[in-house]
């Protein structure tokens, strides 16, 4: 059964697709929400809290509903990403953005405004201040959020099942297909490997937490 896993091209491709999507979605989510959280927490722009509400809106919808909405939208507006990994990346980023907001907003609230003001008085522009002052201070929250989004992206199924196409399967889709086809021996083998991989990610998260001072992940 385990030899079947390593010799089956669809399974190998699904592993790479899952890793690529998880890495990209975690990175985009954490960087994008760090900017949104700065606007919400550190500025006095009118309606800034509306951004927080919009970013948290995907929590209201199940993944299946969100996937269906994205599918209908991109079928009506043919942009050329339907049936590719790009549309799955759009859904992943949208669905997991609320988690990035929670991690980043908690960290952003702990950064004193005086640090930004001191940088600005020294002649630093906004981008330099954000890159050299805020991002290093946000590192524990960014790291914790990145690992969490990476893990939940790896196991995402409900939205992916509506948006994948042949050749763009992810691991969760392959597990579902093995179940549907009655290949329970191969399913069990892949499930064991999948659980061990997730366990390794959790252990890595705990190590990184101790290494960089993240208390909870």
Segments from the language model and where they lie:
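Membrane-embedded alpha-helices of multi-pass transport/permease systems
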Residues: 31-35, 68, 94-116, 154, ...
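C-terminal transmembrane helix and the adjacent membrane-cytosol boundary/short C-terminal tail
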Residues: 39-40, 47, 105-116, 120, ...
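Hydrophobic transmembrane alpha-helices
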Residues: 54-61, 87-97, 147-154, 164-166, ...
